[in-house]
Amino acid sequence: CSCNNDLVEYKKNDLKITLEKGESWLHDFPLFLGINKKNPPQIAIWLEDRDGNYLSTVYVTHKIATQSWQMAGKNRRKESLPHWSYSRGVKYDDGLYLPTKKEPFTDGLTGATPHDGFDVKMQPAEGLKQFRVKIEINHSTDFNDNYPKSAQEGDKNYSGGKEGSGQPAVIYAA
Protein backbone atom coordinates (compact mmCIF):
# COMPACT_ATOMS: atom_id res chain seq x y z
CA CYS A 1 0.00 0.00 0.00
CA SER A 2 1.36 3.45 -0.87
CA CYS A 3 -0.49 5.20 1.92
CA ASN A 4 -0.49 5.06 5.69
CA ASN A 5 -3.96 4.90 7.20
CA ASP A 6 -3.10 5.30 10.88
CA LEU A 7 -6.09 5.61 13.17
CA VAL A 8 -6.41 8.92 14.96
CA GLU A 9 -6.64 8.36 18.68
CA TYR A 10 -8.40 10.86 20.90
CA LYS A 11 -7.34 11.56 24.46
CA LYS A 12 -8.96 13.41 27.33
CA ASN A 13 -9.54 17.11 26.48
CA ASP A 14 -9.03 16.57 22.73
CA LEU A 15 -11.61 18.19 20.51
CA LYS A 16 -12.98 16.61 17.35
CA ILE A 17 -14.55 18.88 14.74
CA THR A 18 -16.58 17.05 12.10
CA LEU A 19 -17.71 18.61 8.83
CA GLU A 20 -20.22 16.46 7.01
CA LYS A 21 -20.81 16.59 3.28
CA GLY A 22 -24.33 17.70 2.36
CA GLU A 23 -26.11 17.61 -0.99
CA SER A 24 -24.62 20.99 -2.04
CA TRP A 25 -21.04 20.26 -0.89
CA LEU A 26 -19.81 20.02 -4.48
CA HIS A 27 -20.95 22.98 -6.55
CA ASP A 28 -20.87 23.46 -10.33
CA PHE A 29 -18.07 25.88 -11.21
CA PRO A 30 -18.40 27.07 -14.83
CA LEU A 31 -15.23 26.55 -16.88
CA PHE A 32 -16.04 27.31 -20.54
CA LEU A 33 -18.47 26.34 -23.33
CA GLY A 34 -21.06 25.19 -20.79
CA ILE A 35 -18.63 22.77 -19.12
CA ASN A 36 -18.71 22.75 -15.33
CA LYS A 37 -16.31 21.37 -12.76
CA LYS A 38 -17.51 20.07 -9.39
CA ASN A 39 -16.05 22.55 -6.93
CA PRO A 40 -15.75 21.92 -3.16
CA PRO A 41 -16.05 24.81 -0.70
CA GLN A 42 -13.27 26.88 0.82
CA ILE A 43 -13.06 26.36 4.58
CA ALA A 44 -11.31 27.92 7.55
CA ILE A 45 -11.50 26.72 11.17
CA TRP A 46 -10.01 28.92 13.88
CA LEU A 47 -10.11 29.70 17.59
CA GLU A 48 -11.02 32.92 19.35
CA ASP A 49 -11.06 33.81 23.02
CA ARG A 50 -14.38 34.60 24.71
CA ASP A 51 -13.97 38.27 23.78
CA GLY A 52 -13.73 37.47 20.06
CA ASN A 53 -9.96 37.93 19.74
CA TYR A 54 -8.26 35.66 17.19
CA LEU A 55 -6.03 32.99 18.76
CA SER A 56 -4.99 30.58 16.00
CA THR A 57 -6.05 28.80 12.84
CA VAL A 58 -6.76 25.10 13.16
CA TYR A 59 -7.36 24.36 9.47
CA VAL A 60 -7.65 26.27 6.21
CA THR A 61 -7.98 25.00 2.65
CA HIS A 62 -4.84 25.05 0.55
CA LYS A 63 -6.15 27.32 -2.21
CA ILE A 64 -6.72 30.32 0.03
CA ALA A 65 -3.63 29.63 2.17
CA THR A 66 -1.34 29.66 -0.87
CA GLN A 67 -3.39 31.66 -3.41
CA SER A 68 -3.24 28.69 -5.79
CA TRP A 69 -6.56 29.46 -7.49
CA GLN A 70 -7.10 28.07 -10.97
CA MET A 71 -8.31 30.53 -13.59
CA ALA A 72 -8.48 33.47 -11.15
CA GLY A 73 -5.80 35.53 -12.84
CA LYS A 74 -4.61 38.18 -10.41
CA ASN A 75 -7.89 38.09 -8.44
CA ARG A 76 -6.82 37.19 -4.89
CA ARG A 77 -10.42 36.21 -4.03
CA LYS A 78 -10.82 38.56 -1.07
CA GLU A 79 -14.49 37.56 -0.93
CA SER A 80 -13.69 33.89 -0.36
CA LEU A 81 -13.23 33.72 3.44
CA PRO A 82 -13.46 37.35 4.59
CA HIS A 83 -14.28 36.78 8.27
CA TRP A 84 -11.28 34.48 8.80
CA SER A 85 -9.03 36.82 6.80
CA TYR A 86 -9.94 39.90 8.85
CA SER A 87 -10.01 38.00 12.15
CA ARG A 88 -6.34 37.07 11.71
CA GLY A 89 -5.47 40.77 11.41
CA VAL A 90 -2.51 40.21 9.07
CA LYS A 91 -2.44 42.97 6.45
CA TYR A 92 -0.23 42.36 3.42
CA ASP A 93 1.64 44.88 1.25
CA ASP A 94 -1.29 45.27 -1.18
CA GLY A 95 -3.65 46.24 1.66
CA LEU A 96 -5.57 42.94 1.66
CA TYR A 97 -5.85 40.57 4.61
CA LEU A 98 -5.22 37.46 2.51
CA PRO A 99 -2.08 35.35 2.29
CA THR A 100 -0.10 35.82 -0.93
CA LYS A 101 1.82 33.43 -3.15
CA LYS A 102 5.04 34.99 -1.84
CA GLU A 103 3.79 34.95 1.77
CA PRO A 104 1.53 31.90 2.10
CA PHE A 105 -0.29 31.03 5.32
CA THR A 106 1.86 28.64 7.32
CA ASP A 107 0.61 29.02 10.91
CA GLY A 108 -1.83 26.12 10.92
CA LEU A 109 -2.83 22.97 9.17
CA THR A 110 -3.61 23.44 5.50
CA GLY A 111 -5.06 20.75 3.35
CA ALA A 112 -6.38 20.04 -0.08
CA THR A 113 -9.87 21.34 -0.54
CA PRO A 114 -11.93 18.37 0.68
CA HIS A 115 -14.28 16.68 -1.78
CA ASP A 116 -16.03 14.95 1.12
CA GLY A 117 -16.70 15.53 4.80
CA PHE A 118 -13.77 15.28 7.20
CA ASP A 119 -12.69 15.42 10.84
CA VAL A 120 -10.16 17.73 12.45
CA LYS A 121 -8.52 16.72 15.72
CA MET A 122 -7.48 19.55 17.98
CA GLN A 123 -5.61 19.66 21.27
CA PRO A 124 -6.25 22.99 23.00
CA ALA A 125 -3.12 24.69 24.33
CA GLU A 126 -2.25 24.14 27.97
CA GLY A 127 -4.30 26.47 30.13
CA LEU A 128 -6.82 27.30 27.39
CA LYS A 129 -10.06 26.44 29.17
CA GLN A 130 -12.65 28.55 27.37
CA PHE A 131 -12.59 29.45 23.71
CA ARG A 132 -14.81 29.74 20.67
CA VAL A 133 -14.39 27.59 17.56
CA LYS A 134 -15.35 29.34 14.33
CA ILE A 135 -15.84 27.75 10.93
CA GLU A 136 -16.28 29.75 7.72
CA ILE A 137 -17.39 27.99 4.53
CA ASN A 138 -17.80 29.51 1.07
CA HIS A 139 -18.44 28.38 -2.50
CA SER A 140 -17.22 30.15 -5.62
CA THR A 141 -19.86 31.27 -8.13
CA ASP A 142 -22.83 30.53 -5.84
CA PHE A 143 -24.92 33.32 -7.39
CA ASN A 144 -28.61 34.02 -6.79
CA ASP A 145 -31.08 36.92 -7.22
CA ASN A 146 -29.63 38.81 -4.24
CA TYR A 147 -25.97 38.23 -5.22
CA PRO A 148 -25.97 38.09 -9.03
CA LYS A 149 -23.01 37.54 -11.29
CA SER A 150 -23.83 40.88 -12.93
CA ALA A 151 -23.22 42.98 -9.76
CA GLN A 152 -20.51 45.57 -10.35
CA GLU A 153 -17.62 46.52 -8.07
CA GLY A 154 -18.95 49.17 -5.69
CA ASP A 155 -22.48 47.67 -5.59
CA LYS A 156 -23.50 46.56 -2.09
CA ASN A 157 -24.09 43.02 -3.40
CA TYR A 158 -20.83 42.74 -5.37
CA SER A 159 -19.05 39.50 -4.53
CA GLY A 160 -16.01 39.34 -6.77
CA GLY A 161 -17.34 39.37 -10.31
CA LYS A 162 -18.17 36.45 -12.58
CA GLU A 163 -15.74 34.15 -10.74
CA GLY A 164 -16.54 35.55 -7.32
CA SER A 165 -18.47 34.00 -4.48
CA GLY A 166 -22.05 34.98 -5.13
CA GLN A 167 -23.70 34.46 -1.76
CA PRO A 168 -21.61 35.42 1.28
CA ALA A 169 -19.75 32.83 3.31
CA VAL A 170 -21.54 30.95 6.08
CA ILE A 171 -20.02 31.20 9.57
CA TYR A 172 -20.60 28.81 12.45
CA ALA A 173 -19.46 29.40 16.03
CA ALA A 174 -19.50 27.14 19.07
Where are these regions (language model features)?
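Exposed beta-strand and adjacent loop surfaces of beta-rich binding modules
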Residues: 14, 40-44, 130-132
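Short beta-strand elements
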Residues: 147-174
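Bacterial Sec-dependent signal peptides at the C-terminal "C-region" and cleavage site
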Residues: 1-8
